């Protein structure tokens, strides 16, 4: 089997050396180029024919997202992953065509060198077989009135949502989620989301989605009420997120927990909890992602009466999680990404 041809672009000589030395030990990966200057790197793509490019976000002369917007149209078969310090700009690179990203050492708590290299190698391998997609422009919605300062949790400051939309995604999901929720009007039932992502980045991602959507979007906290017009995104880290219910309605319950289906937070944990308390009042959506997280939970949601939707293979960056859910019989309908928002909204037509 041919080796994955990898190009590394980072203005730090120390980090380039660290990365090429360690990633190059994997027998399935061949380092074909290492550059500190993205402009120089772009001139050599045609000759070196990399399968995957691992690049920094903040570099002299050209940012990572600018590099991708320049290179991807000319070399559409090349895949990219971003290795970035803590910055919301990483999501600009995702929109420009990057398959995935990894937080640089020091950008996320508890750096483990061995775990970091293992994660990068895994993401390089996934990226090499992923599908690339071009997404539509993400224009912010008209400005909303500033939200009131949150009260002690749980809060009941808005209309409690009688229905719940639960969404799970992994590789390629940051853009896929936006492609769905940007079509939701401000009065859409409450949405809860698990997107596999490093700690801290989820807050920046929620802020980005909030600028684009008509709904209010934020990183979830323990006890947040699931309210009409609000999207809650599970924080990355060591807490699992569950949906709970009391006399006032649905709320999020976050608690430290072991990985489930290989992840924390886990889509399976969220979906399974939704099946127990929302059942027929919920819609479950599983989007692009590697592995099987969410397949069991979505199947349980369907068994309990929820309507379930899986993204189809053609529109997925990685057709893993939706495929496993489909194989288990957990998908009511399988749809292209562009049709999922309307399918969700049809289920709640006339009821919130």
Predicted regions located by residue number:
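Conserved acid/base catalytic micro-environments in cytosolic active-site loops
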Residues: 2-4, 13-24, 28, 34, ...
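Conserved acidic carboxylate
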Residues: 10
């Amino acid at each position: 089997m041919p080796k994955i041809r990898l190009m590394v672009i980072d203005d730090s000589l120390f980090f380039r050396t660290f990365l090429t030395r360690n990633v190059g030990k994997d027998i399935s990966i061949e380092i074909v180029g290492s550059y500190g200057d993205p402009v120089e790197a772009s001139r050599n793509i045609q000759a070196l024919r990399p399968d995957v490019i691992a690049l920094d976000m903040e570099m002299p002369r050209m940012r990572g997202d600018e590099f991708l917007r320049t290179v991807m149209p000319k070399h559409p078969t090349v895949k990219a992953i971003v290795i970035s310090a803590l910055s919301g700009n990483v999501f600009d690179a995702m929109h420009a065509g990057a398959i995935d990203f990894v937080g640089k050492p020091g950008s996320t708590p508890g750096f483990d060198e061995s775990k970091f290299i293992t994660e990068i190698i895994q993401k390089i391998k996934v990226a090499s077989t992923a599908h690339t997609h071009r997404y539509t422009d993400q224009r912010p919605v008209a400005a909303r009135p500033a939200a009131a300062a949150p009260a002690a949790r749980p809060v009941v400051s808005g209309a409690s949502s009688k229905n719940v939309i639960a969404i799970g995604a992994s590789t390629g999901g940051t853009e896929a989620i936006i492609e769905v929720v940007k079509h939701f009007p401000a009065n859409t039932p409450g949405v809860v989301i698990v997107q596999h992502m490093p700690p801290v980045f989820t807050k920046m991602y929620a802020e980005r989605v909030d600028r684009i959507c008509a709904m209010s979007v934020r990183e979830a906290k323990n006890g947040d009420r699931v309210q009409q017009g609000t999207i809650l995104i599970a924080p990355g880290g060591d807490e699992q997120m569950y949906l709970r219910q009391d006399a006032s309605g649905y709320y999020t319950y976050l608690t430290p927990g072991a990985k489930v289906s290989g992840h924390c937070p886990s889509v399976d944990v969220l979906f399974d909890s939704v099946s127990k308390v929302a059942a027929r009042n919920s819609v479950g959506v599983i989007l692009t992602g590697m592995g099987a997280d969410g397949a069991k939970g979505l199947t349980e949601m369907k068994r309990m009466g929820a309507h379930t939707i899986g993204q189809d293979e053609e529109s997925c960056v990685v057709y893993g999680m939706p495929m496993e859910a489909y194989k288990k019989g957990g998908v009511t309908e399988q749809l292209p990404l562009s049709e999922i928002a309307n399918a969700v909204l049809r289920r709640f037509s006339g009821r919130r």
